[in-house]
Amino acid sequence: MTNLATTMLPDLIEIQHASFHWFLEEGLIEELNSFSPISDYTGKLELHFLGKDYKLKQPKYDVDESKRRDASYSVQMYVPTRLINKETGEIKEQEVFIGDLPLMTERGTFIINGAERVIVNQIVRSPGVYYKKELDKNGRRTYSASLIPNRGAWLKFETDKNGLVYVRIDKTRKLSAQVLLKAIGLSDNEILDSLSHPEFYQKTLDKEGNPTEEEALVELYKKLRPGEPPTVSGGQQLLESRFFDPKRYDLGRVGRYKLNKKLRLNEADTTRVLTPQDILAAINYLINLEFDVGTTDDIDHLGNRRVRSVGELLQNQIRVGLNRLERIIRERMTVSESDALTPASLVNPKPLVAAIKEFFGSSQLSQFMDQTNPLAELTHKRRISALGPGGLTRERAGFAVRDIHPSHHGRICPVETPEGPNAGLIGSLATCARVNDYGFIETPYFRVESGRVRKDLDPVYLTADEEDDMRVAPGDIPTDEEGNIIGESVPIRYRQEFSTTSPEQVDYVAVSPVQIISVATSMIPFLEHDDANRALMGSNMQRQAVPLLRPERPLVGTGLEAQAARDSGMVIVSRTHGIVTYVDATEIRVQPHSPDNPAEKGEEIVYPIQKYQRSNQDTCLNQRPLVYAGEDVVPGQVLADGSATEGGELALGQNILVAYMPWEGYNYEDAILISERLVYDDVYTSIHIEKFEIEARQTKLGPEEITREIPNVGEDALRNLDEHGIIRIGAWVESGDILVGKVTPKGEADQPPEEKLLRAIFGEKARDVRDNSLRVPNGEKGRVVDVRVFTREKGDELPPGANMVVRIYVAQKRKIQVGDKMAGRHGNKGIISRILPIEDMPYLPDGRPIDIALNPLGVPSRMNVGQVFECLLGWAGENLGVRFKITPFDEMYGEEASRDTVHGLLEEASQRPNKDWVFNENHPGKIQVFDGRTGEPFDRPITVGQAYMLKLVHLVDDKIHARSTGPYSLVTQQPLGGKAQQGGQRFGEMEVWALEAYGAAYILQELLTVKSDDMQGRNEALNAIVKGKSIPRPGTPESFKVLMRELQSLGLDIAAHKVQLSEDGESADAEVDLMIDSQRRAPNRPTYESLHTEEDLEEEEV
């Protein structure tokens, strides 16, 4: 391996940590200072926030306790405030509580109401000025410039086909540019002197006139406030507040930086409002474009899009809260007596608390953390979304926004993005990328000096803008020992085009071939041999792999597994040099000492270990110690493995013996055939922990009670409950079993008349309660692993109205079974179609049965050949007893490097004793395989190897579902849909066509009536089935009645008529009321349901 794979990546969740740090150190203070001072309407009272001295109190609970109690992990913010009474000169100082601020955990997450959440980074258009070229229908070019602030009114300048310059304020009607320039107080000379082409601008003056400053202000007021009497002072005030008032208009630091850069100004970084010079320079640049001077902007270029991370999003939300707070403070100052006022009585923390709660609880960017496995967690924190407040919407986003842009190179991964409506709107940060102070994404490069790569110097981080004018070579170009680039011509990127140049011309070289892709994609070995669409699926499916009972790291990896595991926060990492003094399943203790002198000891550090915790996705979080007592440890060493890691490396799946061969059609269409060994040996067994919760509330009729005394339940059903009616830990439960017994008081109205009679006779003996116990849902079973009880008496915080909350955790071991989804790392996914006994599986010449048979037809059309390389290299590795780390993009070691490497290693493996059958020169990579049922060899050699296969979280147990009778929708009275609602399968329009084509009249009639929404009919049908009678004729479906009512509401008289024979044989017309169900007769049709006895028939006729 070269130095490429050993280059350690930067801390992968730095983007979260750094942003939150910035918020605590600068962002929060900045906001508090911008609102200080707040004065009342008369100006005699002033309230100052002393933002830089704000304090955070210790959190009430630590991280684990917050999760246990369903609380938020947050701190109280206190700000020193000063109230000054201008009339009396009195000054009052006080520390005021302004709200709770959720704290970021070490892993870059927040704990809100006991659930771990992640704030996703948002990518938005950067404030600044943008120039755009448009062609009208006659093919004439016109240009427009948009001045976009961080907050405030947009300003748009445009030229029309006659070469006149106009301006629009906030998308209103257009004004002559001269009106705006004169209104902001510029003289004619100042305007014309600062333009490069005053003669072009003169046309606008000739056509639109040249107003004085007063006329311009009146004109402006007319356009912006039509219908109000225009005044000069009104125009002045309007203009001031729109563009020159820091409260209403803010370019932001970034906006000022972009504006200075584009228009070559040198305004100070602190000038956050527009200046007349900005507007003049913007118009000048626009006019220059007409003369082909300057460039138009590409809004999808990453130089024009910036990332807003946690800190900034939170700062914006705090601004919203402080805005509301400011209004309240002003009102209180005005209303109250000034002597009695104190800062604490003025400042009400509610609006700020609400704003922060709203942001963390319901913002589109605050997401429930995907915790399926460590990789999913890491990727979620590095996600970049264009959606959310201030961003795009799915419907409005066109193709250009979603597409890969040349400036994404090394910044945003071109591969990892969702499939479906969000494709391209949600991306992932590339492995080496970082976000700079302005929010632009940077990526590192090594300097090249006269053809020599300076790897001895620190890499330089460049933004997309800076990189555009450089000649940048990729990270996989061959170099010699000194770092001189080998070869005459080097492929480079220059100004977003690919070309070649001589080594001396190259300015920079990429740090590593992996730097252009994201962490998940960089876990795919032989990525360069896979089609991008399949690599995308592979990246996304690794995030859905379930942590298995016995994790096993891949035989063929990429070398980044260890860092991904470490940065995900799932493993425990030593912070110091030291000696392990104690290890058990719950904690590791380390006695630190100085690296040079072991005698200098520090205070003992205790690392707690998580055991069998439930993750957000119901998978199991469990850590296992890797060190032993007395072992020396160094900083950064992994002390304990987490879920889906082994030896401190990511281990999402298992290495299993795979053959690419069809077997009796069981792997048709991507289905997968597996061996029973994977079930028996628990190769793909995972643990899932589910949480069930019940609360005893205070009702109008009295409190609900958690108890063992449940009406109408036998002792057998209660055998596992303790004296309080709560299940004991360790009990095995199946669907329908009681977990927590609960009874609810029943009102008089709920009681049937016979019960009222009994109560009247026997007095208050029978307790009027209803069984409301928590039971195990349908299709679930498992063992109770934990029970937590929270009560008011113990001082726990409970939801309003609840007296007691009980949580039960049920764990189940799920072996792999037919219907589960499996996948490789190359987007090769499939559903298990059959589990064969070991003796029937095809076997190798040494008698080993295959573990899994995949369809060879899944490879050619999908073009993910990487799986074949992986499978063969794994085969060589297994026979040689070694693991491989293969960095993607290996062509720098020569043409066809992957193929040569694999070929050479397979040959080497076949030279080991008794391994000559492993490799056959005549058909390399293929082996003779025998049929397990007959012992005959298959008629041609088969590709066999070790593949790393994952079991995905889409488990059949969670999806399988059946319904006989169940709930119905309130309005349409049709059965509900979906497993969660205990719903039915929708027999849709096209399915009905199929039955109509067969003429299956009775099935159709039942589908549309008794099985769906004929209310009376379905009850009668059920009774008839239960009693074994024939099913009566159906009535009118509810949906038809709804249609009738809708037509009647339109004034249409809809009625059904039938022809009846009267006594004298005349036929008469009678209207039928479809809204009421008349008495039904049994249908005159063959009865399949039951054989009638004579008594039955007599009963029916009555």
Curated annotation (Swiss-Prot):
HAMAP family hit by this protein: RNApol_bact_RpoB
Region annotation (Disordered) ranges: 1076-1102
Pfam family, one: RNA_pol_Rpb2_7
Organism of provenance: Synechocystis sp. (strain ATCC 27184 / PCC 6803 / Kazusa)
Gene3D superfamilies linked to this entry: 2.40.50.100, 2.40.50.150, 3.90.1100.10, DNA-directed RNA polymerase, beta subunit, external 1 domain, DNA-directed RNA polymerase, subunit 2, domain 6, RNA polymerase alpha subunit dimerisation domain, RNA polymerase Rpb2, domain 2
GO CC terms, sorted: DNA-directed RNA polymerase complex
Known role: DNA-dependent RNA polymerase catalyzes the transcription of DNA into RNA using the four ribonucleoside triphosphates as substrates.
Lineage, opening ranks: Bacteria, Bacillati, Cyanobacteriota, Cyanophyceae, Synechococcales
Broad class of enzyme this protein falls into: transferase
Family according to the record: Belongs to the RNA polymerase beta chain family.
GO molecular function per UniProt: DNA binding; DNA-directed RNA polymerase activity; ribonucleoside binding
Protein name: DNA-directed RNA polymerase subunit beta
